[in-house]
């Protein structure tokens, strides 16, 4: 994985089992690897993922060719082009943690941006998610804190909560995933 973390498939499975019903239409605007799309489609849902990197999209679509999972190569900011309002049942994402892991050298890759620009783009993209979900549906955002060059938290967790609430979501729950020491990418 070239030093980039991979989403925990058990976490993807649990979130799918807890927050969806078979046949739900799920989506992710920072799709990244194949894990969530593969898991949720294997469990009987339809998945749409937006992923910035063409090579990752191609790989994901190849891995999911026999499943109801489709990855679109585009910027998360263009969510309105690909997903209609009030059309989805579940949103799941594990967005870039600012510059903690660098995914590509693309100019519009959030992992290449200074923190102020990251939060501006992140807020715009995430702010569009609420309108895509049908009423009484859930969103799961997997985030953790990131430190700046001075060792201070950049407030990714509280800013994500604020962004989601400002766009219309109710802060329903918080789940803490405890990782074993030494499992994160270096």
Ranges and model annotations:
Residues 1-186:
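Class I S-adenosyl-L-methionine-dependent methyltransferase catalytic core
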